[in-house]
A protein has these predicted regions:
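Flexible, compositionally biased loop and terminal segments
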Residues: 1-232
């Protein structure tokens, strides 16, 4: 089976999963967080090298304050309880996205885990927090302009490969496979630059129901596709 080097996941459907069961949306998020570790373990076991999950978008601030509060509470608990396993399994965790709008406690917890795991090499686990693809591209352009104005780079050096280094995933291979759970078929401002040639897969399962068998199925579907990258 042809296993993708890098998988990106939009974890969609937590709220609908909870509503279907007559439960609060926050319970759906809690169950969704539980699913993350299982999928990371299975991805690593199958030979995937990088996993990037969309945990909180720049647009998610439009949700209720109570829901946002619970989301970051779950994030803090998740990171605190996950540190030992990350070290034991040689997994590096990295957060991508804005950091100026997230509460200080959450950012502090993120930094602790990033620092702790920075030398781990077997697997890279990216969590997109307060992330948006348009923001990512705009921020990269802003930083390039700043470096050019400060005479750190030349105009002639700027091309696609150079620009890519300024993005949140700079230095990492672009995703080979994007999975969006819940059946919704859109990318919702996620990794806009990086998904240019990514294979897309949209299972009907809500994220809390997306288990290891579903991941294996996604990879099996991916392995049957022929990626041409514009060639015949």
């Amino acid at each position: 089976m042809n296993v993708p080097h890098h998988i990106a996941i939009i974890m969609d459907g937590n709220g609908r999963w909870a509503k279907k069961r007559g439960l609060p949306r926050t319970i759906g998020h809690r169950e969704g967080v539980k699913r993350i570790k299982e999928i990371v373990r299975e991805a690593k076991k199958l030979g995937v090298k990088i996993l990037t999950i969309f945990a909180f978008s720049t647009e998610n601030w439009n949700r209720s304050k109570n829901e946002i509060k619970f989301l970051f509470q779950y994030l803090n608990i998740f990171l605190k309880n996950y540190k030992k396993e990350l070290m034991r399994k040689d997994i590096r965790l990295k957060a991508i996205g804005r950091r100026d709008r997230i509460d200080k406690k959450s950012i502090r917890q993120v930094k602790v885990v990033e620092e702790l795991t920075k030398n781990n090499k077997s697997f890279i686990f990216n969590i997109a927090l307060d992330y948006g693809g348009r923001w990512d591209i705009t921020e990269a352009a802003r930083r390039i302009v700043s470096d050019y104005q400060n005479k750190l780079i030349s105009k002639e050096a700027i091309n696609e490969d150079f620009f890519e280094q300024y993005l949140s995933l700079g230095g990492l291979a672009s995703p080979d496979l994007l999975i969006r759970t819940s059946g919704e078929q859109r990318i919702s401002n996620f990794l806009l630059w990086d998904l240019a040639y990514t294979e897309l897969y949209f299972p009907q399962k809500y994220w809390p129901d997306f288990n290891t068998k579903e991941l294996e199925k996604a990879i099996e579907v991916y392995s049957q596709r022929i990626r041409k990258f514009g060639k015949i």
